[in-house]
């Protein structure tokens, strides 16, 4: 309602009441105006009424919501189901144009504004999380793997002779396939074991660059957040190597935005060396549905080149989800979530260590991994190879999701490349182990339930192993008795034959 509408309302309802309602609306509009002027995430989160007012105001700016609109094109924002329209707050046109995912759509001013505001808020939050010198970013409606592929395809035009991507090994399929899908050959650099941790082999990286030739290498593809006992790559050292050899550097920061340590590594890497782009998942860092990622970097023209590489328009759903989430939380709400995640990591580490010791296991020492933990399974794996896999299945059927039981000796072929010791990030890690991670949104009751159910599962597995050992021992005893009996019978036969020798 505009001032004229309020004035008209005063003729029907007491002016004092109408003015009070007008002031209340102005409070909502003030928050919206500040957002549009500053382009920053508000310190305090909005309530739902402000959010819905803002989204409604944006939606009515799109041509499909114009009163009396006559559409005669092939894409006019028509929706058959009213439920689908409500699900998307009537934002039907998506974002971008055929030549650029960040471009403005003439038919969809509201959706275009939503896209611009979302990208601005996300940039603000990346700075809040620790990468203060980030220059540009945009939300792309693809998960991390395909977003990495988009980065590699953009680099293809800048390095036409390149055919290889240097990649310190991490046993996760999508990041490997992202390189293959882009048409490049991943050069896998095995990690080195330092204590319990698997760390970047810097000498091997540099040796491979010299062997292949820098001009034949598209980029170095490094990783921050990962499953223990692997830890984030040595980003500062890798960034220096990339700067020295003039090789682009793309960082897979899938769920690292929630970790101040991972973000500090990226900030420092960009300060001392070269980082061209870093990619993070929306669902892993902002607790929204799967399907979106943020591509960010320190050189605005290069990030714009990546956005122009995206063919066609794109879904606005991931942008809408993260916009609603950030406006609901505000900076203070998101900072609180980051703080709670750190506290949960310490709590999970303490509880898992106690449980490990109670079962004659130990928590692997991985101080450079700020999110994931690992507990040895030596006492289980020593009895039976399948016991580790069985433990993982038991946890899943008892509604424990996210835990990974990693046996020794797994062999997996991904896009033609065979990984030995798959899931453990190394050909021959010393022991089987169980992973658990303290990611954003985890609560204390999640940790308590996990520890309780893991304890029960470990006890069940051990009882079954003990029973199997007893049965196996009994079978061996029976077999030995049968062998003795058989030998006795044969001896009797021999003696009988001797006693029945021919008469003289």
UniProtKB/Swiss-Prot annotation:
Coiled-coil segments on the chain, per record: none
Region span, Phosphate loop (P-loop): 96-106
Listed cofactors: pyridoxal 5'-phosphate
Segments of this protein annotated with the region Tetramerization: 1-44
Effect of substituting residue 313 to S: 30% of wild-type activity
Listed result of changing residue 313 to E: Virtually inactive
EC number: 2.9.1.2
CC annotations in GO: cytoplasm; nucleus
Keywords assigned: Cytoplasm, Phosphoprotein, Protein biosynthesis, Pyridoxal phosphate, RNA-binding, Selenium, Transferase, tRNA-binding
SS bond partners: none
Keyword Transmembrane: no
Entries under InterPro entries matching the protein: PyrdxlP-dep_Trfase, PyrdxlP-dep_Trfase_major, Sec-tRNA_Se_transferase, SepSecS/SepCysS
Reactions it catalyzes: O-phospho-L-seryl-tRNA(Sec) + selenophosphate + H2O = L-selenocysteinyl-tRNA(Sec) + 2 phosphate
Main localization of the protein described in the UniProt heading: cytoplasm
N6-(pyridoxal phosphate)lysine: residues bearing it: 284
SUPFAM superfamilies linked to this entry: PLP-dependent transferases
GO BP annotation list: conversion of seryl-tRNAsec to selenocys-tRNAsec; selenocysteine incorporation
Modification sites for Phosphoserine: 14
Subcellular location field: Cytoplasm
Top-rank taxon: Eukaryota
Positions annotated to bind substrate: 97-98, 105, 313
Family: Belongs to the SepSecS family.
Function noted in UniProt: Converts O-phosphoseryl-tRNA(Sec) to selenocysteinyl-tRNA(Sec) required for selenoprotein biosynthesis.
Name assigned to this protein: O-phosphoseryl-tRNA(Sec) selenium transferase
